[in-house]
Amino acid sequence: MSGRGKQGGKARAKAKTRSSRAGLQFPVGRVHRLLRKGNYAERVGAGAPVYLAAVLEYLTAEILELAGNAARDNKKTRIIPRHLQLAIRNDEELNKLLGRVTIAQGGVLPNIQAVLLPKKTESHHKAKGK
C-alpha cells in the first residue's frame, strides 16, 4: 500500500475558532482580516485582533444592557434607536465616547431649563401659616 489515505496516522483535530479559544462571541478571524486589509499597519500581531474583538464585544454588551433597561422602562420588548440614544446619553462615559455621534431616529433627551419652570409663589405659603 502507498502511504496515502486516511488509514494510518493521527486523525485531524476538530477546528477550533480563535473566538472560542478567547471566549468571545465577536469574530477574531474577521477582525484580523479587516486589520490586514485596512492598511492600518504593515504587519498585524496575533494578539491585536483578539484584543480589539474583546473591546468591541464589551462596548456592545454595555450599550445593549443599558438600552435593554431603557426599553423595559418604556414597557417595550424590542430595542429601538430611541432606547440606544437614551442609554448612551444618560451614561456619562458612553456619552463622552460617543459625544459627536448622531443616532438616526434617536430623538433628544427630555430637558426643561430651570428658568422656564413656573415659579413657586410666596402667597401660597403665607396662607398656610395663618
Swiss-Prot record:
Modified sites of kind Phosphothreonine: 121
Please spell out the taxonomic lineage of the organism that makes this protein.
Eukaryota, Metazoa, Chordata, Craniata, Vertebrata
Q: Does the keyword Membrane apply?
A: no
PTM-bearing positions, type Phosphoserine: 2
Q: Which family does the entry's similarity section mention?
A: Belongs to the histone H2A family.
Q: What would you give as a GO molecular function for this chain, any one?
A: structural constituent of chromatin
Q: Which residues carry this modification: Symmetric dimethylarginine?
A: 4
What PROSITE patterns does the entry give? HISTONE_H2A
Instruction: List the biased-composition ranges (Basic residues).
Output: 7-19
Q: Where in the cell is it found?
A: Nucleus; Chromosome
What is its induction behaviour?
Up-regulated in hepatocytes after treatment with the procarcinogen N-nitrosodiethylamine (NDEA).
Residue positions, PTM N5-methylglutamine: 105
Q: Which CDD domains match?
A: HFD_H2A
GO BP, one example? heterochromatin formation
Return the protein name. Answer: Histone H2A type 1-E
Provide the positions where the record notes the PTM N6-(beta-hydroxybutyryl)lysine. Answer: 37
